[in-house]
Amino acid sequence: MEELIHLAYAIDTFYFLICGVLVMWMAAGFSMLEAGLVRSKNTAEILTKNIALFAIACTMYLFLGYYIMYSSPEGGFLPNLGFLIGEENTMDAVLSGGEDAPYYSMRSDYFFQVVFVATAMSIVSGAVAERMKLWAFLAFAVVLTGVIYPVSGYWTWGEGWLDAAGFSDFAGSGIVHMAGASAALAGVLVLGARKGKYGPNGEVHAIPGANMPLATLGTFILWMGWFGFNGGSELKMSDIDSANNVAQVFVNTNAAAAGGVLGALILSKLWFKKADLTMALNGALAGLVAITAEPLEPTGQGAALIGAVGGAIVVASIIFLDKLRLDDPVGAISVHGVVGLWGLLAVPLTNADATFGAQILGAVAIFAWVFIASLVVWLILKAIMGIRVSEEEEYAGVDIAECGLEAYPEFTKGSK
């Protein structure tokens, strides 16, 4: 019997770590997606942001964020602060066999959680692209990953007051994606739109991305990484029930992404009279975000429908935000924020234990906390160091101004 417990512990720990690696691979997906959707003169800077934010997220969560997010007391509003991850699980604790016996390594839990933090910050990167100062962005990343995200994470996954209120978010439609979009929205409001994006009479000028093949590759990488994002949130797979659950989560994750693509393509055809690749890519991501709140309970067909609704929502949301003159170069606020809200509200449709009241409460609480806290931080950064590059630097491209190099030097010389 002891040998079986040892084996189950090893399997669950290894599964957790592999899923964490898949989620880390999503950082490459975000990098490629954003690099493809910005103009060539801004590519090196956005790639720099993505690798730097990942390093900052890993560091801040290691030294501070993890201890805020997983602190006592249960059901509380304000977290306590510890200073050590603590001793690893002992053999006696694992072999005790009780309901509370640990079944995976604490270090694997930390590793899985830290890559989620980086995902939340990656969402901000694309929304403020092409006009934000690099170091202002990185300073904000320190605060979001070290404090803002962990506090709302404590309320939910850390068994705080939202968890006690019955809020349900399996893998993070709200906790990760809507939180990242809320921080992005605050940044966009303080930062303003790119030069030339909107005309004086309400015109919206398209600013195409430089490399759609790269953006498409990034989307497929994210699609792949999402299997770890949702599948790992089952937390184990060493018994029959959990293994079956993981398989269902994988099926539903894939079905929702496919539904999102079709929903976005069909609405784009009806609305614009053409198939829009950018909308299709965002539709895939929207389907993935939508199912993330509850990827286990729906049938595969139900997951496809949830994803299709998300794909349609993202098309309408991107157009609507442009009408409001909220400039989001990659559609991150729509994909992760608006569709993240849809994902939370869809949970009670398939999960009998969830309620619309608790889901709405959780959505409002997460948005209010992250948006207000982020807005304060953005305003402080604006006052202290400025957050926007000069007009000349924006027209020339932030690659040279912020990084001193270009991603495509043969093609961007003198480009405006």
Positions of the model-derived regions?
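Hydrophobic alpha-helical transmembrane bundles of multi-pass membrane proteins
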Residues: 1-416
